[in-house]
């Protein structure tokens, strides 16, 4: 276990990216409980909210202490913590925390009362989801070195099971009170084994028998889904400790009654951001300059709560400053991601044998567009992990998939998992969203109607838009952009919010020029962007003073803030300046403010480097909901009334 987990690979698992985990590890901010509204917004917007709001009841927890209970107020005894669910957005450090937890145990630094730790990543369990297994057989497949152990040892020893990446699961978990399992050798399909009990250690149960019997043997065969469910509920190996990690939107798959402790990884706080850059960048002067730049660019600064984004930023900024100390440094998310993509393409060019510039350009375009198509199609399906069949759907020959991952080593990764099956993913969800946005804009530029119509027909359960209507025959850019705004407003959990920011950013002419080697041509987008930003500003401000309460609450606070950040992504500062002037003025009661406008004002106050002298909520002409949304601004005010 020590050999497996002592090294951290930032980006793809290539030797040049290898770093000793103990050297670079920066303690993450893990709290007990969860931040307010964690399931109601896009993951990145959750980080925006975390950056603005501190909860006095937050209890920081070190990852090695997640099973250690704190005494409750008024009670000296500590309750037993058996099952922990840790939530956190993509790239926030869930898997690295698991890695550190195991490494410290293997090195004898923590949790020495534990005899065995077993890591069962859902991305690997997916590959055997249709198979029948006993727990004993499953553990042998994952850890062949256990071959000589008696299966009874699992019941006699202290065991920790770690289920990493519930959000990546394609397995149906079953939590029926009528089905119970408690033997580690009972064989079952992944889903069924979890919920049934059997008393014979060698019994093989069919699904039908499984539903009506109890299971208590680790050698009995069940479905993988049932097996996992039974471990989580404690019906199988009730003394085992369970740690489950998940992105927030998927965490509700497990009934709360089976969870003893809920934790949330909130990523880096302010000192930890700086610590990360100083650990990673050996040149102290360069590290200070990069930290200073990120602090000035607020959207970049907030995103650096996410460790993966810190890595992308340090990669880009180190490269730019190494080539030219006076280089213009990216100010927006889209600019940062474009530069990261260009760095990877240049690395590929240095390795590639082709010397003909035109052939090299064509090859780069084909590779990136293929990967971008995968990103777009899978984003529309809500997938972050892909298998061979998903790649074939986008026209990528699976025999070439390793070539693709080798070409853009930090963008698209291939991993061998159980039974040496391959799984594929982008380095981070946000990079998938960036490439998906690029692909949609690229399709617009080359007049490829199919992806445009596929996007138009995309809808969530909440979406009232007519999915039969195609985009305008002429496909004007403003039609595409305003359609994207509407789609993002109705997408579940804000899953298109960051995609929208990237789509607007990519369409900006200055960014088109950066991408000119990948686009067949650029187009004049200034008027389309002007019309789209006007549409966004009208939506934020609201038009009707007499709007009813339901209309007033149509845009959530997080959606309103994302729309505001979309304006900054295309470098439209007009609303930002208008709000700054409004807040400083004495004219708060002259104009009615929509709830969305109040969310944006609150966000601006909180993001300001300089605290507001006084915030008097009663002076604002708004609804009760609007006033409620202004309350969060008091965190950056010297006086509140």
Residue map of PLM features:
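Intracellular innate-immune signaling modules
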Residues: 1-641
């Amino acid at each position: 276990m020590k050999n497996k987990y002592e090294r951290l690979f930032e980006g793809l698992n290539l030797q040049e990216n290898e770093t000793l985990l103990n050297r670079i590890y920066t303690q993450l901010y893990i709290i007990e409980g969860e931040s307010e509204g964690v399931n109601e917004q896009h993951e990145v917007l959750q980080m925006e909210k975390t950056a603005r709001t501190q909860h006095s009841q937050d209890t920081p927890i070190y990852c090695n202490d997640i099973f250690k209970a704190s005494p409750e107020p008024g009670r000296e005894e500590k309750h037993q913590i058996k099952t922990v669910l840790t939530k956190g957005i993509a790239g926030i450090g869930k898997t690295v925390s698991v890695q550190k937890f195991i490494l410290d145990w293997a090195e004898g630094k923590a949790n020495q009362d534990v005899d065995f730790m077993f890591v069962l990543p859902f991305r690997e369990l997916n590959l055997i989801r249709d198979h029948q297994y006993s727990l004993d057989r499953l553990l042998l497949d994952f850890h062949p070195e256990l071959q000589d152990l008696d299966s009874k040892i699992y019941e006699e020893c202290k065991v920790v099971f770690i289920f990493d990446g519930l959000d990546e699961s394609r397995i149906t978990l079953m939590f029926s009170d009528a089905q119970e399992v408690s033997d580690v050798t009972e064989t079952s399909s992944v889903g069924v084994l979890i919920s049934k009990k059997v008393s014979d250690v060698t019994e093989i149960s069919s699904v039908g028998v499984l539903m009506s019997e109890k299971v208590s043997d680790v050698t009995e065969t069940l479905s993988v889904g049932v097996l996992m469910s039974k471990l989580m509920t404690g019906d199988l190996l009730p003394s085992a400790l369970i740690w489950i990690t998940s992105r927030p939107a998927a965490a509700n798959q497990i009934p709360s009654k089976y969870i003893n402790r809920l934790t949330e990884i909130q990523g880096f706080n302010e000192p930890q951001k700086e610590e990360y850059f100083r650990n990673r960048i050996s040149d102290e002067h360069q590290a200070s300059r990069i930290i200073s730049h990120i602090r000035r660019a607020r959207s970049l600064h907030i995103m650096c709560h996410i460790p993966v984004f810190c890595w992308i930023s340090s990669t880009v900024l180190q490269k730019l400053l190494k080539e030219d100390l006076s280089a213009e440094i990216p100010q927006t998310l889209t600019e940062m991601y474009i530069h990261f993509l260009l760095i990877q393409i240049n690395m590929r060019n240095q390795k590639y044998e082709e010397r003909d510039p035109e052939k090299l350009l064509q090859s780069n375009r084909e590779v990136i567009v293929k990967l971008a198509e995968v990103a777009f199609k899978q984003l529309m399906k809500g997938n972050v992990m892909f298998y061979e069949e998903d790649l074939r759907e986008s026209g990528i020959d699976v025999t070439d998939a390793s070539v693709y991952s080798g070409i853009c080593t930090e963008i698209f990764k291939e991993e061998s998992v159980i039974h040496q099956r391959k799984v594929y993913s982008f380095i981070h969800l946000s990079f998938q969203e960036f490439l998906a946005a690029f692909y949609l804009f690229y399709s617009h530029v080359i007049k490829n109607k199919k992806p445009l119509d596929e996007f138009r027909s995309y809808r969530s359960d909440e979406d009232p838009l007519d999915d039969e209507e195609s985009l305008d025959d002429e496909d004007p850019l403003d039609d595409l952009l305003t359609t994207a705004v509407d789609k993002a407003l109705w997408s579940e959990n804000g899953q298109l919010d960051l995609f929208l920011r990237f789509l607007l950013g990519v369409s900006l002419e200055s960014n088109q020029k950066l991408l000119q080697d990948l686009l067949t041509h650029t187009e004049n987008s200034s008027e389309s962007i002007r019309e789209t930003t006007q549409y966004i500003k009208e939506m934020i401000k609201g038009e009707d003073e007499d709007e009813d309460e339901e209309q007033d609450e149509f845009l959530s606070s997080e959606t309103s803030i994302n729309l505001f950040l979309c304006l900054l992504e295309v470098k439209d500062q007009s609303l930002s300046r208008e709000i700054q002037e409004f807040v400083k003025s004495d004219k708060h009661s002259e104009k009615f403010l929509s709830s969305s406008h109040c969310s944006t004002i609150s966000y601006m106050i909180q993001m300001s480097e300089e605290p507001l002298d006084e915030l008097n909520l009663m002076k604002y002409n708004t609804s009760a909901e609007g006033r409620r949304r202004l309350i969060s601004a008091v965190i950056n005010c010297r006086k509140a009334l």
